Amino acid sequence: MARVYNFSAGPSMLPEKVLKQAQAELLEYGGSGQSVMEMSHRSKWFDAIITDTEATLRRVMNIPDNYKVGFFQGGATQQFAMVPLNFMTTGKADYIVTGNFSNLAAKEAAKFGEAKIVASSKDKNFTYIPDVNAINYDKDASYIHICQNNTIFGTQYVEVPQVEGVPLVADMSSMILSKPVDVTKYGCIYFGVQKNVAPAGMAIAIVRDDLLGHAADNVPTMMNYTTLLAKDSMYNTPPCWCIYMTGLVLKYLENDIGGLANMQKINEAKAKVLYDYLDSQDFFNNPVEHRYRSTMNVTFTSPDPDLDKKFCAEAADAGFVNLKGHRLVGGMRASIYNAMPAEGIDKLVDFMEKFRKENA
């Protein structure tokens, strides 16, 4: 069977070249006589893998030396608790709620202190991003938290909050590595890897040095950033396969794509094809304010929920899978992460136009 175009929000497509390299090395890696899946995390081979993966991430993202990088189990959802447990030193933090995951992060933080929602786009069903320069931030907040791209509702920030003396913490799960990011604007960046980096099973956190070491003594060992970061992510057995796959994807971005600036151009061109089509007709509708449209997650609906179901079923039969929208939104969602080839977008648009003509 031919490979399908997988528009899943995560786990999602991986570059075919990366998959083929992993396939070639699956049974035996680098003269070790064993698979990465079965080798000791203390072996010289895996030590080289994790060291090289971190070094490549630092190069690709231009991460300064005063930031630590850690490979964590538990996904981004675990980070919702780790952030307040480690950083909420004043007992309060500001949260901007622009969708489901930022709302869940705020709810989790409220278990450990005052998680003040200083702005929200819920009033328009999360179809825009609040003006970050018009928000009344708390100068005594321990940090400001955002979700930089909203997977479910298809929005993204065009600028981020910058408040002197208050660190910015960002969940970048669904946009990481899609474009260059100025790491110095953030105190902490975290992301689950299953959308744009690697298979499911890991989160990566990038934490500025001055934010570490302030967790209370009763914070569980594995919920303390310092535990893993002080041991170069080797305090316990790390998610070895995910780290290996992350390394392959990063090398692909660096060597084949030519870095994140090139990746951004490719992604913006792909998204433009789909948005231009959506704007050219009145059968399918994208509700997001144009300025805040996500480059990674494109949401749309047809005139009727039954037609939405029909579209998703016929699309799957045609080789376009996982287009069903999130249960909170309905409709359709095309997640067009880094690994989605441009031809996948072109063919999807052709299918959408065919469906429109047959069902309008």
Language model feature labels by segment:
Residues 3-54:
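A glycine-/small-polar-enriched, mobile loop at the entrance of the PLP active site in fold-type I
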Residues 77-144:
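PLP-dependent aminotransferase-like
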